[in-house]
Swiss-Prot record:
GO molecular function per UniProt: ATP binding; biotin carboxylase activity; metal ion binding
Described purpose of this protein according to its UniProt entry: Component of a biotin-dependent acyl-CoA carboxylase complex. This subunit catalyzes the ATP-dependent carboxylation of the biotin carried by the biotin carboxyl carrier (BCC) domain, resulting in the formation of carboxyl biotin. When associated with the beta1 subunit AccD1, is involved in branched amino-acid catabolism with methylcrotonyl coenzyme A as the substrate.
Subunit structure: The biotin-dependent acyl-CoA carboxylase complex is composed of AccA1, which contains the biotin carboxylase (BC) and biotin carboxyl carrier protein (BCCP) domains, and AccD1, which contains the carboxyl transferase (CT) domain. The AccA1/AccD1 complex forms a dodecamer.
Residues that bind Mg(2+) 2: 290, 292
Protein name, per record: Biotin-dependent 3-methylcrotonyl-coenzyme A carboxylase alpha1 subunit
Record GO biological process: L-leucine catabolic process
Lineage: Bacteria, Bacillati, Actinomycetota, Actinomycetes, Mycobacteriales
The Biotin carboxylation domain, residue ranges: 1-448
Domain of life: Bacteria
Record field: catalytic activity: N(6)-biotinyl-L-lysyl-[protein] + hydrogencarbonate + ATP = N(6)-carboxybiotinyl-L-lysyl-[protein] + ADP + phosphate + H(+)
Covalent link (Isoglutamyl lysine isopeptide (Lys-Gln) (interchain with Q-Cter in protein Pup)) residue numbers: 322
Residues involved in ATP binding: 148-209
Entry-linked SUPFAM superfamilies: Glutathione synthetase ATP-binding domain-like (SSF56059), PreATP-grasp domain (SSF52440), Rudiment single hybrid motif (SSF51246), Single hybrid motif (SSF51230)
Cofactor binding, note field: Binds 2 magnesium or manganese ions per subunit.
Length: 654
């Protein structure tokens, strides 16, 4: 076994790999870019090496720098995690030349499976079923149009290189195919540097089911059951589970054999995942889609039902050991479901979010696991993937796993950064999800019905009472500075605070000291109230009913969470709210953290409502920000500037 392993990744997967290395007594080495200098994976590793600045191509994707870090620290092996260099055949080959063990498959396996056309042809030779279609190198648009008539509509255009849904197009009308091919080639070339396309017949009501395989260098291959990954948004998985509620035992055995044959066709070594497409209408029929030649984000659900540590077996296989079990030894126990917590705002079309994590609260308990990259103080920016945390629940059956996951998410809060936790719970409560009636369109269909929960009265009241407590604390015993509310003449005046949330804003009035106060939200009833505040908990009693909240505050931004959700309250003193309405210019505000890649207007020019003012890139997506009104524009940013969420980028005045 190795004594030092370098983890060539970041975020939750790096933390998770380091956890296994620590358990096995193996020295861990982290690598990091400048924004990640204080990241959790860096702090938890035994050693760490700086790679370079934020752009991945200058840090995490720089093969030379990663191998140099391994040489400097004496690492005998490199674990690539997922993403970055994990499926890079050149990196695997470079590791071999440097005599460092790449904890993944041989370079040839990565090359074959990374080319969708070559992969389909390779697995078909081993009797693995493939989707009817046409997959040859060098197919022109005219050839693809001709072939589509034979394949049968609807057809799915797919790029030979890459993944993540980029370059994919669903075409149901033959007249739209030529235009879709042009668009798909352009996106494939932009994303992967390769515009090779192929066609597949589109499977109606498709379900995405994948099989985990493990293979050693001695010819042994086993599968560890399947995972259901149909709950996706824009081809990105959100909730995954194992086993699939769709497959019967006979189909499970057949699809497992097909996955093992897929691994054998490229002499696979290590952990890999074979993805299949299965029609919800024909669950006994499955087709090969692709093989991911790495550990998957969703591997914890397989670990939960098998009791195996997949990272440990990557290490053992990489060190030359044989698998310590045969196919008949593997028993699937219970059901496990994983939810991915992203930095995104579901109420704003899932725009990426960001900011500084003020506090993080993660669940624990029977059957609950959390794989996380977060610490208080972590800065979530736009340089990397928005995945923050994975919450996994294991139960005796699917119903128990669903309930445990929902309860775990209710105890999950990331204060300081907007996340999708509320949306995840919305999905778990959906009837189709509860009964397992899934396909890859379910999540997108249900997204349209999601509405974020406005801040309830008690949360707004808690915000006002917290403000009263903070004022009293700052007074530090100064009788005249404390917010008692008493004024000359014997009457009591309230301290008013405007509490603004994305969906609701109210003025909260508080009379008296925080331990014995009265509170009013808007024009509602005046209630007796009190508040007690500790470092992580705020206990508020209103009319005899006590509620406990988790909280964090910075720069008059207060975050409050309980089992119902998380709310971001912005405080403004009452006198600052009443301004001359016409005097304030309209603003163009960034809805997410990112980088300015274009400024489309000149500062001082006259523009019209709807004109694009600034283009911001975040998470590899471009967002054009338009003028809300007509007028003269003052641009406040330049191309290349890094901007924060809600940062004012331009002002427009009549």
């Amino acid at each position: 076994m190795f004594d030092t392993v370098l983890v060539a990744n970041r975020g939750e997967i790096a933390v998770r790999v380091i956890r296994t290395l620590r358990r096995l007594g193996i020295r861990s080495v982290a690598v990091y870019s400048d924004p990640d200098v204080d990241a959790r994976h860096v702090l938890e590793a035994d050693a760490a090496v700086r790679l370079g600045p934020a752009p991945a191509r200058e840090s995490y994707l720089d093969i030379g720098k990663v191998l140099d870090a391994a040489a400097r620290t004496g690492a005998q092996a490199i674990h690539p995690g997922y993403g970055f260099l994990a499926e890079n055949a050149d990196f695997a080959a470079a590791c071999e030349r440097a005599r460092v063990v790449f904890l993944g498959p041989p370079a040839r396996a990565i090359e074959v499976m990374g080319d969708k056309i070559a992969a389909k042809n390779a697995v078909a030779a081993f009797d693995v079923p493939v989707v009817p279609g046409v997959a040859r190198a060098g197919l022109t648009d005219d050839a693809l149009v001709t072939a589509a008539a034979e394949v049968g509509y609807p057809v799915l255009i797919k790029p030979s290189a890459g993944g993540g849904g980029k370059g994919m197009r669903l075409v149901q009308d033959p007249a739209r195919l030529p235009e879709a091919l042009v668009s798909a080639r352009r996106e494939a070339m932009s994303s992967f540097g390769d515009d090779t396309l192929f066609l597949e017949r589109f499977v109606l009501r498709p379900r995405h089911i994948e099989v985990q395989v493990l293979a050693d260098a001695h010819g042994n291959v086993v599968h560890l059951g399947e995972r259901e990954c149909s709950l996706q948004r824009r081809h990105q998985k959100v909730i995954e589970e194992a086993p699939s509620p769709l497959l019967d035992p006979q189909t499970r055995e057949r699809i497992g054999v097909a996955a093992c044959n897929t691994a054998r066709c490229v002499d696979y070594v290590g952990a890999g995942t074979v993805e299949f497409i299965v029609s919800a209408q024909r669950p006994d029929e499955f087709f090969f889609m692709e093989m991911n030649t790495r550990l998957q984000v969703e591997h914890p659900v397989t670990e939960a039902i098998t009791g195996l540590d997949l990272v440990e077996w990557q290490l053992r296989v990489g060190a030359g050991e044989k698998l310590g079990f045969a196919q008949n030894d593997i028993e699937l126990r219970g059901h496990a479901i994983e939810a991915r917590v992203y930095a995104e705002d579901p109420a704003r079309e899932f725009l990426p979010t960001g900011g500084r994590v003020l506090a993080v609260f993660e669940p624990a308990g029977p059957g609950v696991r959390v794989d996380s990259s977060l610490l208080g103080g972590t800065v979530v920016g736009s340089d990397y993937d928005p995945l923050l945390t994975k919450v996994i629940a294991h139960g005796a059956d699917r119903e128990e796993a669903l309930d445990r996951l929902d309860q775990a998410l209710a105890r999950t809060a990331v204060l300081g950064v907007q996340t999708n936790v509320e949306f995840l719970r919305f999905l778990l409560a959906d009837e189709r999800v509860r009964v397992g009636d899934l396909d890859t369109a379910v999540l997108d269909e249900r997204s349209a019905d999601f509405t974020a929960r406005p801040a309830p009265d008690d949360v707004l009241a808690a915000g006002g009472l917290y403000r009263q407590w903070a004022l009293a604390r700052r007074a530090q015993g100064d009788l005249w500075a404390a917010p008692s509310g008493w004024r000359g003449g014997g009457h009591m005046a309230p301290v008013r605070t405007a509490m603004r949330t994305p969906l609701r804003s109210e003025t909260v009035s508080v009379w008296g000291p925080p331990e014995s106060a009265q509170v009013q939200v808007g024009d509602g009833e005046i209630d007796c109230a009190s508040v007690q505040v500790t470092r992580e908990q705020m206990s508020v009693t209103i009319s005899g009913l006590r509620r406990d909240y988790r909280w964090a505050e910075a720069d008059r931004h207060l975050w409050i969470a309980d089992e119902r959700g998380t709310w971001h309250l912005r405080e403004a003193e009452e006198h600052k709210i009443h301004r001359a309405v016409g005097a304030r210019p309209a603003e163009v505000v960034s809805p997410m953290p990112g980088s300015v890649i274009a400024v489309q207007v000149e500062s001082g020019s006259q523009i019209s409502a709807g004109d694009v003012v600034v283009v911001v890139e975040a998470m590899k997506m471009e967002h054009s920000l338009e003028a809300p009104v007509s007028g003269r524009v003052q641009v406040l940013v330049s191309v290349g500037d890094q901007v924060k969420v809600e940062q004012v980028l331009a002002r427009i005045k009549d």
